[in-house]
Structures are given as structure tokens and as C-alpha cells.
Amino acid sequence: MQIYPLRLLPNKIDFDFMNFKKVSYTFSIILSLISFIWIGMYKFNFGIDFAGGIVIEVRLDQTPDLPKMRQVLGELGIGEVVLQNFGSERDLSIRFGSSSEDNLMKNIELIKSTLQNNFPYNFEYRKVDFVGPQVGRQLIEAGTMAMLFSFAAIMIYIWVRFEWYFGLGILIALVHDVILALGFMSITKLDFNLSTIAAVLTIIGYSVNDSVVIYDRIRENLRKYHKKGITEIINLSINETLSRTILTVVTTLLANLALVLFGGEAIRSFSVLVFFGIIAGTYSSIFISAPILTIFANKKFEK
């Protein structure tokens, strides 16, 4: 029995993507400017990881229902409340922000009374600590360094595997994706925390993977069609990989949609940002990183 590959599109596609490169450049520049302006005006909604807050360590007499506890505490109206296990399954860390010292004790007592009234557990409160913004600044610096190191590692990989102008194309696309992701976070007021740093790194990896698939086909077609110009080869390569690109993005979005809908508040910022980033990364790999090669490679291939 012969097995046929799954295809969402016909074998022969001849859509002129390169005809839209000026439109896509303009569109991306406008979106990037909007992101910069919005971030400058409204900043980010920093979560407890970066803004600081209160940490309560508590031990229970049995394994708690964490999703239910997150839901109940999230409805108190005191901002982000993060519950995590540490040590055993009966040890909990409860973190939340505090807008001022005046409501500090009030919010601590509110959390304690809410837990006591809604759950049939015995709570042993072991420690209450204040985490200052200095820790948040250190985490921001660590997150920034993680992104810079990922950029550097990706550039080294691309320059070793491809030509230098391929690396520039991917670098521009990645900067574009990160700017749009940060702008999206600022506009939607998603919590900026450690999980969103992980989401940005995930977006970077996804975008690079998409671009490398197209770049591989471009390199292959450059060897195969010596008489064709770089613009025609790029357009051909995008069309040849389009079915794979669409299949990948659809399956990835569907998997991530489950996290958005059912993952709960604990990973909401991560899942929503990754969902947006998959769309942005797919767009940039087709309309930014591939077409922009014509700027750097025209002189080499179209003499």
C-alpha cells in the first residue's frame, strides 16, 4: 500500500509573494512603531517575578486542589496570585503583589481567611517574606541576557550553515518578532513574568525553525536553477514549502489553543503570547526573512 503525504495545498503553487514585499515591509514597520510607542506610553504589566511582592510559605495536611485554589484566590481582586508547590506536594508557596504597605497585612489576612473558609485543609503558615523590586531587576537582567545569548547562538549557527546575508535576514525577522511580542504584551496587559520570557524564547525558536526550512529550499534552488534570479528563486522556494509551513502552524496553534483555553491562569501569559508569536513568526518567515534576502543578495546573484 502506497502512503501519500498529507497536503493542505496543491503540488504546484505559483503565488507571487515577492510582489507584496513592499507592503509587508511597510506593514511591519507600522506595527513595530505602534509597539514602541505603546510600550513607551503604557509600559508593561510587571508580574510578581519582576515587581516584587509577598511570599507566604504554607504546609497543608493533604494534597491541595491547586487549580481550584488559584481560581478562588484569583477572584479576590488583589492582582496576580501565584501558587506553586515546593518540596513536597503539601508545601505551597503563595505569591502576590502589594501596591502599598497599608494594605499589606490586610491582603495577607484576606488570603488566609479565604483559604480557611473555602478549603477543608489544615494550614500551617511557616513564613511570610517580602520580595523587593531589586530581585525583579536582577531577573530582568537575567532574562535579557538569556535572549541576547539565544540571538548570538542563532546567528553563529546560521552563519556557519548558510551565507552571512541569511543570518542578517533571520536577525531582522527575530527582532521584528520580539518587538511585536513585547508590544502585544503591553497592549493586552499580559503579566510580564518569567513565563513570558520563556514564551519569547519559544517564539524565537519557532521563527528560526520556519525561516531555516525556507532558507534550506532557497539554497537548494540556488544550486539547481543557475539561470534564475534571486527574486524568482525566493518566490519559488516559499511556494514549495508553503504546504509544510501551513500544516506546521495549524497543528502548533491547535496544540497551543488547548493551553490557552484549559491551561488556567498560571500559564495564561505564556500560552497567549506563544499563540500570538506563532502567527507573527510564520508571517515574518514568509514576508520578512525570505524577501529581505534580495536586499543583501541581489548583487551576488543578479550581476
UniProtKB/Swiss-Prot annotation:
<keyword id="KW-0811">Translocation</keyword>
<keyword id="KW-1133">Transmembrane helix</keyword>
<dbReference type="Pfam" id="PF07549">
    <property type="entry name" value="Sec_GG"/>
</dbReference>
<keyword id="KW-0813">Transport</keyword>
<dbReference type="InterPro" id="IPR005665">
    <property type="entry name" value="SecF_bac"/>
</dbReference>
<dbReference type="InterPro" id="IPR000731">
    <property type="entry name" value="SSD"/>
</dbReference>
<dbReference type="InterPro" id="IPR022813">
    <property type="entry name" value="SecD/SecF_arch_bac"/>
</dbReference>
<dbReference type="GO" id="GO:0005886">
    <property type="term" value="C:plasma membrane"/>
</dbReference>
<comment type="subunit">
    <text>Forms a complex with SecD. Part of the essential Sec protein translocation apparatus which comprises SecA, SecYEG and auxiliary proteins SecDF-YajC and YidC.</text>
</comment>
<feature type="transmembrane region" description="Helical">
    <location>
        <begin position="194"/>
        <end position="214"/>
    </location>
</feature>
<dbReference type="GO" id="GO:0006605">
    <property type="term" value="P:protein targeting"/>
</dbReference>
<keyword id="KW-0472">Membrane</keyword>
<dbReference type="InterPro" id="IPR048634">
    <property type="entry name" value="SecD_SecF_C"/>
</dbReference>
<protein>
    <recommendedName>
        <fullName>Protein translocase subunit SecF</fullName>
    </recommendedName>
</protein>
<feature type="transmembrane region" description="Helical">
    <location>
        <begin position="246"/>
        <end position="266"/>
    </location>
</feature>
<comment type="function">
    <text>Part of the Sec protein translocase complex. Interacts with the SecYEG preprotein conducting channel. SecDF uses the proton motive force (PMF) to complete protein translocation after the ATP-dependent function of SecA.</text>
</comment>
<dbReference type="GO" id="GO:0065002">
    <property type="term" value="P:intracellular protein transmembrane transport"/>
</dbReference>
<keyword id="KW-0653">Protein transport</keyword>
<keyword id="KW-0997">Cell inner membrane</keyword>
<dbReference type="Pfam" id="PF02355">
    <property type="entry name" value="SecD_SecF_C"/>
</dbReference>
<comment type="similarity">
    <text>Belongs to the SecD/SecF family. SecF subfamily.</text>
</comment>
<feature type="transmembrane region" description="Helical">
    <location>
        <begin position="164"/>
        <end position="184"/>
    </location>
</feature>
<dbReference type="InterPro" id="IPR022645">
    <property type="entry name" value="SecD/SecF_bac"/>
</dbReference>
<dbReference type="GO" id="GO:0015450">
    <property type="term" value="F:protein-transporting ATPase activity"/>
</dbReference>
<feature type="transmembrane region" description="Helical">
    <location>
        <begin position="272"/>
        <end position="292"/>
    </location>
</feature>
<feature type="transmembrane region" description="Helical">
    <location>
        <begin position="140"/>
        <end position="160"/>
    </location>
</feature>
<feature type="transmembrane region" description="Helical">
    <location>
        <begin position="28"/>
        <end position="48"/>
    </location>
</feature>
<keyword id="KW-0812">Transmembrane</keyword>
<dbReference type="InterPro" id="IPR022646">
    <property type="entry name" value="SecD/SecF_CS"/>
</dbReference>
<dbReference type="InterPro" id="IPR055344">
    <property type="entry name" value="SecD_SecF_C_bact"/>
</dbReference>
<keyword id="KW-1003">Cell membrane</keyword>
<dbReference type="GO" id="GO:0043952">
    <property type="term" value="P:protein transport by the Sec complex"/>
</dbReference>
